[in-house]
């Protein structure tokens, strides 16, 4: 799987957070083994923890956004949304 690029505003990407992100995004391998790039952008304010991810697979760009009051919960929601979209792009065997 492609390395994960992480950037953000108002957040420090700690080793613990990075490990959590790597673990959660590792789930994507089961749904798409041809991911060419992953970029995650975090935006943290007093009230919200928001994240947006852009994933590139051959022929498609998949984008998802999530937000909650907890960054770890936001990442969980984001990964679930991406998996749902990746499953839509899986080749069908008829």
Enumerate the language-model features and the residues they cover.
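N-terminal, polar/charged subdomain of small-to-medium soluble alpha/beta proteins
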Residues: 1-94
